[in-house]
């Protein structure tokens, strides 16, 4: 089953900020302990219950809450599985620069980070001395998420929850924390309640070329004839200093604009570049010495892959089908240069057109095989 994460920002100060900070710090310390123990274990268990039985006691000594302990174990096991998938040495992995805590156990209600009817969250916190408390945080709720939160409560939808501290500091001798509550729900549940168009009678195809500051859409018919081209910009999101939440919002609105345009111009199938399999290593939880996060090309690859994932996630809301194509030679090739001159397109629109053509070729061959 696939999942989607809802992000709800918040700002708190004083004792509430202190409670969140101490819990996140203990969770990070416990994750360091867990990662160290896992690296020292010659043969790691093959199942979730095996990991929990092996490491629960040691991690509970650091953060005395069973659900948070299991959240630590789930996180480190996820890192281990990603390393296996990507061929990266697990023992070389280090944790990234983050502060967060999570309940990875899917349930309703989520006991440690509990959603209430007024969209507030009752959160279990742990002090540095191990003392437990229960605090209330009321995040900012985007208008379109209120429907989903209401449905989670109404249908008692099981989910997981995480608190991420994005920034913190001291103002007038008072600690403040800026963070996010992240709820992870099944993507089918998301589509069920968020779909904008149930039917699509279009017969055209679209190709999308994604870059760090724009997405280019080319619309073609089944014969490969170019019908429409349009560029959708999100320059501000890629500028240095643009906060991640602001960047996500800008890109998200731009993606919706592009998909709305595609829907109203008859696009039934959208072809995207097949993103590299980056796994969970592309997230903020770890860093790897061999893959420097300062490397520009790698950062661009991650950024573009995230945008492609966002497009993939939102496309079903418009009753548009998504297919992936191999993006190689859609930017630098003799064919690319010829098409660019023939139609008077810029290089990114030309790449989008080539992606659409390649998609039609692949899609048609699949249709013939399955017919």
From Swiss-Prot:
Lineage: Archaea, Thermoproteota, Thermoprotei, Desulfurococcales, Desulfurococcaceae
Similarity annotation: To A.pernix APE_1804 and S.solfataricus SSO2105.
Record protein name field: Uncharacterized protein APE_1276
Source organism: Aeropyrum pernix (strain ATCC 700893 / DSM 11879 / JCM 9820 / NBRC 100138 / K1)
């Amino acid at each position: 089953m696939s999942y989607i994460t809802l992000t709800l920002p918040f700002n708190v100060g004083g004792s509430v900020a202190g409670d969140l900070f101490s819990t996140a710090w203990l969770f990070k310390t416990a994750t360091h302990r867990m990662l160290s123990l896992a690296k020292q274990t010659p043969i790691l268990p093959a199942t979730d219950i095996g990991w929990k039985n092996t490491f629960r006691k040691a991690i509970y000594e650091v953060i005395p809450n069973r659900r948070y302990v299991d959240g630590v174990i789930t996180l480190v096991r996820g890192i281990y599985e990603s390393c296996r998938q990507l061929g990266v040495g697990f023992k070389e992995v280090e944790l990234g620069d983050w502060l967060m805590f999570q309940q990875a156990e899917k349930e309703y209600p989520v006991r440690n980070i509990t959603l209430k009817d007024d969209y507030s969250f009752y959160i279990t916190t742990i002090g540095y001395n191990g003392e437990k408390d229960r605090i209330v945080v009321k995040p900012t709720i985007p208008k379109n998420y209120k429907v989903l939160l209401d449905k989670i409560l109404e249908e008692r939808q099981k989910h997981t929850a995480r608190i991420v501290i994005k920034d913190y500091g001291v103002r007038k001798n008072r600690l403040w924390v800026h963070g996010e509550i992240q709820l992870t729900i099944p993507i089918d549940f998301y589509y069920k309640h968020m779909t904008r168009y149930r039917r699509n009678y279009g017969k055209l195809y679209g190709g999308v070329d994604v870059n760090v500051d724009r997405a280019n859409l080319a619309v073609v018919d089944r014969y490969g004839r170019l019908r429409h081209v349009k560029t959708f910009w999100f320059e501000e999101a890629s500028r240095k200093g643009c906060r991640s939440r602001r960047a996500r919002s800008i890109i998200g609105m731009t993606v919706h604009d592009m998909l709305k345009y595609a829907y109203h111009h008859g696009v039934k199938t959208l072809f995207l570049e097949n993103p590299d399999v980056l796994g969970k290593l592309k997230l903020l939880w770890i860093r790897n010495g061999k893959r420097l996060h300062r490397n520009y090309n790698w950062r661009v690859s991650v950024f573009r892959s995230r945008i492609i994932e966002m497009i993939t996630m939102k496309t079903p809301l418009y009753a548009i089908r998504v297919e992936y194509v191999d993006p190689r030679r859609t930017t630098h090739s003799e064919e690319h240069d010829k098409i660019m001159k023939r139609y008077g397109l810029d290089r990114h629109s030309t790449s989008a057109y080539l992606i659409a053509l390649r998609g039609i070729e692949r899609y048609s061959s699949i249709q013939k095989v399955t017919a």
